[in-house]
Amino acid sequence: PGLMQTPIPPWMTLFTAIFMHGSIMHLLGNMWFLWIFGDNIEDDMGHVKYLLFYLATGIIASLTFVVLNASGEASLTPCLGASGAISGVLGAYLVLHPHRRVSVILLRMMVDVPGYIAVGIWFLFQLVSGFVDQGGGGGVAYSAHIAGFVAGMILAKPMSFAWAREETDPLIV
């Protein structure tokens, strides 16, 4: 999304932008996070609800970017990638699996930490980077990441099966 002319109706760009990426590294980074966190959330929601959740958080992230950048030079900046939807998955992971262990690289070693620490550090980085880069010149839509994350946290329980049952997570150590 952005406010530029496109060959498709502008409202469609909210959907299509989720499936476009600016570079191979952008795509690979998003797919890495989706691979680590997405399967758990899909298990919690089922295939159809997960697809709807993914699209909803991606569209909410894109709309937030457009609203916050609707004037000036930033309005012509395209916003694309799955990062807003992936951020939604991370928000859902924080709500549904805060204590599940996640492997992270720390000082050239693999360390298992609770999900709330791994996701919390990622979110803190998004917040700080978003405030530092308010001009939007860095090429990263931090506002979309933050909006997708918050949307994911809000939608996680209503869209999952976990709210209806006592959650027992066998991977908590």
Summary of predicted features, one role per range:
Residues 1-173:
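A detector for small-residue-rich transmembrane helices and their helix-helix packing motifs
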